């Protein structure tokens, strides 16, 4: 599939997701970076969003809890180009009942070429990048062109 440019605005739409055993780590990371995150729009799965809002006061648009469809909601937003960055602290040592949703979420983030951090070290690298707070371009699939070709 051909690729086209997508511009990520200075103010990013950032999705925050964390498995149960990783929520405290994500919450600590958000607290440490709350000043910088306050300049962006935050979205999160249900429990994670509640915790972030309660402990930091940051405004967070909350989806359903991950196992109840929240991961899929975030994935749909990625496909609709409504999420620019995914911060997803997932637990590789414990299986979750909605593991197919987790895989689908990471797959969509890769398909749509958005920056993804799956642990604190990567999240630190990402948030410290100059691109985090400035307009930048990414390459994404040319879905409209793909459809045009397929429907000839």
From Swiss-Prot:
Any one of the GO BP annotations: methylglyoxal biosynthetic process
Source domain of life: Bacteria
Positions contributing to substrate binding: 19, 23, 45-48, 65-66, 98
GO MF terms, alphabetically ordered: methylglyoxal synthase activity
Keywords, alphabetical: Lyase
Gene3D superfamilies xrefs: Methylglyoxal synthase-like domain (3.40.50.1380)
MGS-like domain location: 6-152
GO cellular component terms, semicolon-separated: cytosol
CDD domains referenced in this protein's UniProt entry, alphabetically: MGS (cd01422)
Enzyme Commission number(s): 4.2.3.3
Residues annotated as catalytic: 71
Chemical reaction(s) catalysed: dihydroxyacetone phosphate = methylglyoxal + phosphate
Transmembrane segments: none
Pfam families: MGS
NCBIfam families the record matches: MGSA, PRK05234.1
Family stated for the protein in its record: Belongs to the methylglyoxal synthase family.
Function field: Catalyzes the formation of methylglyoxal from dihydroxyacetone phosphate.
Name of the protein in its database record: Methylglyoxal synthase
